[in-house]
């Protein structure tokens, strides 16, 4: 591995330990040229995943982008960093276990929303407002009305006008229709 300080190719592993519930390996390394120490984290990647965007573009899946989105949704909420990492690891494992290499972005969003809904309802609403592109207060009102009626944690996929789509899936008082 290349040293991040001097760019030298020869580094030695001094210590390896399991990291994040065994889902990754944390390695302490030392550069043979400049003697600087640094840490790397290695994760198992079952397959290369690609995200299919709404405009049918296909881009490589980025775990860091998913983690950043989850962290933003959970910012200033009572969820510690360790739990956020477990959430992200679980989401990535679910995506890898799906058997698909091309995953529509709306499916990733639905998976994240389902998880956030169970963890923190405010984070769920924050994420949904970006994912569904809320533009008006009625969009927030519609999702707030849908929350008490959804007992099983199933999150509707809302294309286009969020309020209309949520209303279409919910009956009177926000109770989700089956």
Curated annotation (Swiss-Prot):
The disulfide bridges present are: none
Q: Which organism is it from?
A: Gluconacetobacter diazotrophicus (strain ATCC 49037 / DSM 5601 / CCUG 37298 / CIP 103539 / LMG 7603 / PAl5)
Cofactor(s) the protein requires to work: Zn(2+)
- List all Basic and acidic residues biased stretches: 7-21
* Zinc finger extent (unnamed): 3-34
Q: Which branch of life, at top level?
A: Bacteria
Recorded hits in InterPro entries, A to Z, give:
ATP-cone_dom (IPR005144), NrdR-like_N (IPR055173), RNR_NrdR-like (IPR003796)
Instruction: Tell me the cofactor note.
Output: Binds 1 zinc ion.
Q: Which GO terms describe its biological process?
A: negative regulation of DNA-templated transcription
Region annotated Disordered sits at 1-21
Keywords linked to the UniProt accession = ATP-binding, DNA-binding, Metal-binding, Nucleotide-binding, Repressor, Transcription, Transcription regulation, Zinc, Zinc-finger
Q: What does this protein do?
A: Negatively regulates transcription of bacterial ribonucleotide reductase nrd genes and operons by binding to NrdR-boxes.
Recorded protein name is Transcriptional repressor NrdR
